[in-house]
């Protein structure tokens, strides 16, 4: 079913909005994927906050024109699914993880920070831990010296006699 001019413009406007908010774009060829597998991929993408769209390539080219994703315009050929993500690594993770289990999904490339990513670039981006994991690792590094100091002080107190002893009551309180 072909779209009329106003419907095409609506699609372009929607994808332009996605591209404006997104940090990452991943493109993958989906030739031969069953409807059930595509539904599973879309569900996984939705759970991770990734917008997956099957678009006509000419509409996709027009939508990314003038954005940071314009660098991939030359690669927009064939049956492609486009994954836009506001998280820097989410789109790459979803597509790369699904491609590991389904050989019919072939990663074609992507873009991040205005630079073209080839297949290996997308896979490397997918291997980067998520923002939450990185923050947890930084917190762990910051907490490590304090926890080590507490352990050393606890061991030192145990060695010297079991920690702070009870202080005797003042003489005035005993006399009263």
Swiss-Prot record:
Coiled coil, from the record: none
A GO BP annotation: translation
Keyword tags: Ribonucleoprotein, Ribosomal protein, RNA-binding, rRNA-binding
Gene Ontology terms, MF aspect: large ribosomal subunit rRNA binding; structural constituent of ribosome
Gene Ontology annotations for the cellular component aspect, listed alphabetically: large ribosomal subunit
Superkingdom, natural source: Bacteria
A UniProt-annotated Pfam family: Ribosomal_L10
CDD domains recorded: Ribosomal_L10
Protein role: Forms part of the ribosomal stalk, playing a central role in the interaction of the ribosome with GTP-bound translation factors.
Similarity annotation: Belongs to the universal ribosomal protein uL10 family.
Subunit structure, interactors included: Part of the ribosomal stalk of the 50S ribosomal subunit. The N-terminus interacts with L11 and the large rRNA to form the base of the stalk. The C-terminus forms an elongated spine to which L12 dimers bind in a sequential fashion forming a multimeric L10(L12)X complex.
Matches recorded under HAMAP family: Ribosomal_uL10
Protein name, per record: Large ribosomal subunit protein uL10
Organism per entry: Polaromonas sp. (strain JS666 / ATCC BAA-500)
Lineage: Bacteria, Pseudomonadati, Pseudomonadota, Betaproteobacteria, Burkholderiales
């Amino acid at each position: 079913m072909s779209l009329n001019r106003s419907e095409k413009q609506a699609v372009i406007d929607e994808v332009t909005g996605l591209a404006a908010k997104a940090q990452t774009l991943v493109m993958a060829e989906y030739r031969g994927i069953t409807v059930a597998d595509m539904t599973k991929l879309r569900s996984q993408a939705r759970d991770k906050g990734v917008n997956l769209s099957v678009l006509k390539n000419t509409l996709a080219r027009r939508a990314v024109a003038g954005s940071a994703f314009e660098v991939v315009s030359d690669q927009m050929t064939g049956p492609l699914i486009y994954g836009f993500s506001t998280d820097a690594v989410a789109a790459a993770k979803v597509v790369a993880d699904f491609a590991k289990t389904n050989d019919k999904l072939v990663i074609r490339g992507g873009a991040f920070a205005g630079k073209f990513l080839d297949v290996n670039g997308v896979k490397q981006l997918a291997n980067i831990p998520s923002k939450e994991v990185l923050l947890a690792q930084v917190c762990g590094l910051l907490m490590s010296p304090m926890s080590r100091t507490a352990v050393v002080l606890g061991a030192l107190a145990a060695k010297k006699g079991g920690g702070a002893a009870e202080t005797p009551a003042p003489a005035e309180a005993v006399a009263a």
